[in-house]
């Protein structure tokens, strides 16, 4: 199988890792991919997965899969299973078993107690609204909580009672004692623990207090010996807090945080909240709808792991933002499928053709290559008196430049004979329901003498073809920036009404009858398609269009 032919773009982290290894700062690189299990992974996560696993692979290190499971109210085992499946589908394997931040809850609690004993943390009774008021703004410093000067003994007692479940949700929190006047709002006495009486998918009902992301993340990195903690740029302002915890706790290692620009893809939404809205309101048919930006959606659409990895190589890793053209992703899958997808013929809008001068009862088994370059063998197409062509390939009154079948005109059937249109049969409403044609028996594999036939069209045998459903997927949003809408509008206003067209009664060549789920094809002259992962069955295939043969949006 060929790989997509793309060059790796620059990755500013590669020389940093190389220098750390060369200097002996680290004997081995250890990275991690730390998703929160509160939704399905999307194309933006693919960039982080390829980056973290790719660096570890390139430099002979390891990458951990760690679930940042500190908010049980929004998390679910369903998401954990889906995330693991997506990472494996992309072609990566994490070191050892998957890890959970909840594995470290006991240690994190012990460290929180140490901060209290050192006078660096306190129990605060402010509610969320009061805390926002006290925190200040980007232009105004915050104010100290009235509970900031509680004694160590009182804080230890209250924190123990928080852990014992004596207080309701939100009644108290544990906060670090740093600097309410800091220009970095993240350092204004951030929350370490919240009260949440919620069942946890890993720890059950053991805990009713849960650590914040900021308190959990760096310490989990340290416990696992992470050398390069790589996250997106929105966490750059969190780095001083990340480092404050590491400096003020007896952690076993000192990881370093690096930030890169997240993936912004035009015509695409990756907000978990908005993706969930699309699902919940029925705008799409689930998280794995082939129009979704989720990895499970791309997989069902027919994208290959190799194409997504190639795309991530193409866009590179840097600290500068910007919007990536979705055409680059479509280029990557076209390159992959052009090189690796078997060819086949499928007629989306069948028009019956009767070849009047072809002997009745005669059948020729024509062999066509499964791929023009790779040695994939051949497929057999029975050719007889009755076939189907696509209705769009015949025009009674053709526009200028039309090179397909017209009254009295000739075309070549792909891999077969030249035929001439002699008569169009119509129903009472004037619709063409059948063509009567004649064939030139001397044109199998060669041009007719004395005349030039320009057009080549695809076809399938009438008797042996298999009926199928074809789903023509297109971009879910018609706007390059779907987040932008008219005043008072919503991103939903940008949904493309033609993002899915379902065609039934299509006719596919016989070899497609037993297409396996996720088997990919180039339907000649139509595009790249995949047998649907869920709905396609032997004898009743369902095909999803992955991408058109060419970029029709850029024209």
Curated annotation (Swiss-Prot):
Binding positions (L-glutamine)? 68, 213
In chain numbering, motif 'HIGH' region lies across 35-45
Quick one: where is this thing mainly located? cytoplasm
Database matches in CDD domains: GlnRS_core
- EC top class, in one word? ligase
Name the domain of life this protein comes from.
Bacteria
* Residues reported to bind ATP: 36-38, 42-48, 232, 262-263
Question: Which UniProt keywords are listed?
Answer: Aminoacyl-tRNA synthetase, ATP-binding, Cytoplasm, Ligase, Nucleotide-binding, Protein biosynthesis
Instruction: Identify its protein family.
Output: Belongs to the class-I aminoacyl-tRNA synthetase family.
Protein name, as recorded: Glutamine--tRNA ligase
Species lineage, top-down? Bacteria, Pseudomonadati, Pseudomonadota, Gammaproteobacteria, Pseudomonadales
Q: Which gene encodes it?
A: glnS
């Amino acid at each position: 199988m060929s790989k997509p032919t793309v060059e790796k773009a620059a990755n500013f982290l590669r020389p940093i890792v190389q220098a750390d290894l060369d200097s002996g700062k680290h004997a081995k690189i250890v990275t991690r991919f730390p998703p929160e299990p509160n939704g399905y992974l999307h194309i933006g996560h693919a960039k982080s997965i390829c980056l973290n696993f790719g660096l570890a692979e390139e430099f002979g290190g390891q990458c951990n899969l760690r679930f940042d499971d500190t908010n049980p109210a929004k998390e679910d085992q369903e998401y954990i299973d889906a995330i693991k499946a997506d990472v494996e589908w992309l072609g990566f394997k994490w070191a050892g078993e998957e890890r959970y931040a909840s594995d470290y809850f006991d240690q994190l609690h012990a460290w929180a107690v140490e901060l209290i004993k050192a006078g660096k943390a306190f129990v605060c009774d402010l509610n969320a609204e009061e805390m926002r008021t006290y925190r200040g703004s980007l232009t105004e410093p915050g104010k100290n909580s009235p509970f900031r000067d509680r004694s160590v003994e009182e804080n230890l007692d209250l924190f123990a009672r928080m852990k014992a479940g004596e207080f309701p949700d939100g009644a108290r929190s544990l906060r670090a004692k740093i600097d309410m006047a800091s220009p970095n709002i993240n350092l204004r006495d951030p929350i370490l623990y919240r009260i949440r009486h919620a069942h946890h998918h890993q720890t059950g009902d053991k805990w009713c207090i849960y650590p914040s992301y900021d308190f959990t993340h760096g310490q989990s990195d340290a416990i696992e010996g992470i050398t390069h903690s790589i996250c997106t740029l929105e966490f750059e302002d969190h780095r001083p807090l990340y480092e404050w915890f590491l400096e003020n706790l007896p952690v076993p290692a000192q990881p370093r945080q690096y930030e890169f620009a997240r993936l912004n893809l035009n015509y695409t939404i990756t907000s978990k909240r908005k993706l969930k809205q699309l699902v919940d309101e029925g705008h799409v048919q689930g998280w794995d709808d082939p129009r979704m930006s989720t990895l499970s959606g791309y997989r069902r659409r027919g994208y290959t792991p190799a194409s997504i990895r190639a795309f991530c190589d193409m866009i590179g890793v840097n600290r500068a933002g910007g919007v990536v053209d979705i055409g680059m992703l479509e280029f990557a899958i076209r390159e992959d499928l052009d090189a690796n997808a078997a060819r086949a013929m499928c007629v989306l809008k069948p028009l019956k053709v009767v070849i009047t001068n072809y002997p009745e009862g005669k059948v020729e088994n024509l062999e066509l290559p499964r791929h023009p370059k790779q040695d994939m063998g051949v497929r057999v197409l029975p050719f007889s008196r009755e076939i189907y062509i696509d209705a769009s390939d015949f025009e009674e009154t053709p526009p200028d430049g039309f090179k397909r079948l017209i009254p009295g005109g000739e075309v070549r059937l792909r891999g077969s004979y030249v035929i001439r249109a002699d008569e169009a049969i119509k129903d009472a409403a004037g619709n063409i329901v059948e063509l009567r044609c004649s064939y030139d028996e001397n044109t199998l594999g060669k041009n007719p003498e004395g005349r030039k036939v320009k057009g080549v069209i695809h076809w399938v045998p009438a008797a042996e073809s298999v009926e199928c459903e074809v789903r023509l997927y297109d971009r879910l949003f018609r706007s390059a920036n779907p987040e932008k809408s008219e005043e008072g509008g919503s991103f939903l206003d940008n949904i493309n009404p033609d993002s899915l067209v379902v065609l039934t009664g299509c006719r596919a060549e016989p070899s497609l009858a037993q297409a396996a789920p996720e088997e990919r094809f180039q339907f000649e002259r139509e595009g790249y398609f995949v047998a649907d992962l869920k709905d396609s069955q032997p004898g009743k295939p369902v095909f999803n269009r992955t991408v058109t043969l060419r970029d029709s949006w850029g024209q």
